[in-house]
Amino acid sequence: MSGKKYFIYKVCATLIVMLFTRASLYAQATSLIEDDGRKVVASVADSLSPLYAQPIEFADTATIEMQPTDSVQKKLRFGKRLINFFFKANTPDPNKRVDFGFLPGPHYSSTQGLGLGIMATATYSMDRSDPTLPRSNASLFSDMTTKGFLLIGLKGNNFFPKERFRLDYRAYIYTFPTNFWGIGYANGNNDDNETNYRRNRVDLMGRFLFRMARNTYIGPMLNFRYIKALEVSPGNMLTLFNGQDLTVHSQTAGLSFIYDSRDFMLNAYRGWFVQLDQTFTPRFLGNDYCFSTTDLTVSTYRKVWKGGVLAGELHGGFNYGNPAWCLMSEVGGNSRMRGYFEGRYRDKNIIEAQVELRQRIKKRHGAVVWVGAAEVFPRFDAMRWKRILPNAGLGYRWEFKQRINVRLDCGWSKNGPGFMFNINEAF
């Protein structure tokens, strides 16, 4: 072997030894031992290179106690905090006023491309001295992809002391390229109708509820929506959009009734949830498309065995009058009929149902399986059995915070599968 090659091999071997030495230091420095009830960093053997450690105390026996340098300690503290954040996030801390956490979520789809979503959640109590007061919650979510999808939103539920009042709110803004098939089941079922366009939307909703009896609330609600369709071909404006405006804004007011006996609203194990919204979008509020809407949701939850919960939901949305193309009832989304392209099937009315079995597998891991069905229709006499849309799927659950799950769902639709990554249970 030539002297040059021998020198190169010697340098490489030296570097490898140094790397393993540093890795060994990190492994030993992070182990903790109990000393008089205090956790201290374990001593590092004095045979390790002083490049990564410094002497801090000399004993009478001439032994040297070593400790990682400040830079190493900072890295260890950061790594420990990061590990604790993910592995102890579901451990409740009664001393925290707000239990907060966030989680990034990379994802990919053929329609949206490669994306990065960031989800954050917080739970808190308006009266910490009252253990019976449900914890309020707020969720912040954002997403962006390589194909031009951009979203940011906030939603939550706030319970005031003694449950006298309840505030539900939702706000989001997004822009993304999407598809449109037209209005009605027949148009949505025709693959040739698929047309591309860009959709911008702003949605603000709030309801302020007064407690009338145990678990029972009633109060006013307001909803502002702004939708704009861009990059639409002139021919599709007439055939698929029925000649309606591509820019729609609506100011809606109404009354909301809620009965909610769920033990925890973000991931219920037992109880009932009934919500009835009667809203009006009249001309005197500045609306070009005038209509009224009755929206009913009934959900129930029941423990069936250890770690198993059976959940069911029935939802109906009924529009009367002249709703715009973008304000009609739609099939699909993150909560119902998962796997369907949101809005492919749309009409004035919808009835949909789903049943889901949720099973905790081990520690923070769980799985779900569900079946569902839906139908959109212009009038009740136009309903047909053959137009019922089937749905089924399964999903993985990871408990990010206590009883707050990150979910990855795969749903099958009449037109193929779809994947969803989100936080909190679907319903």
Question: Over which residues does each language-model region extend?
Answer:
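Transmembrane beta-barrel architecture of outer membranes
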Residues: 113-117, 149-153, 201-205, 248-254, ...
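Transmembrane beta-strands of outer-membrane beta-barrel proteins
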Residues: 100-102, 136-140, 165-171, 217-220, ...
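Transmembrane beta-strand segments of outer-membrane beta-barrel domains in Gram-negative
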Residues: 57-82, 86-89, 107, 168-172, ...
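Outer-membrane beta-barrel initiation region
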Residues: 44-168, 244-268, 360-366, 376-380, ...
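Residues on the lipid-exposed face of transmembrane beta-strands in outer-membrane beta-barrel proteins
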Residues: 104-106, 118-122, 154-158, 204-210, ...
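Cleavable N-terminal export/targeting peptides
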Residues: 1-76
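Gram-negative/organellar outer-membrane beta-barrel architecture
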Residues: 91-101, 107-249, 347, 405, ...
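C-terminal outer-membrane beta-barrel translocator/porin domains of Gram-negative envelope proteins
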Residues: 253-258, 262-361
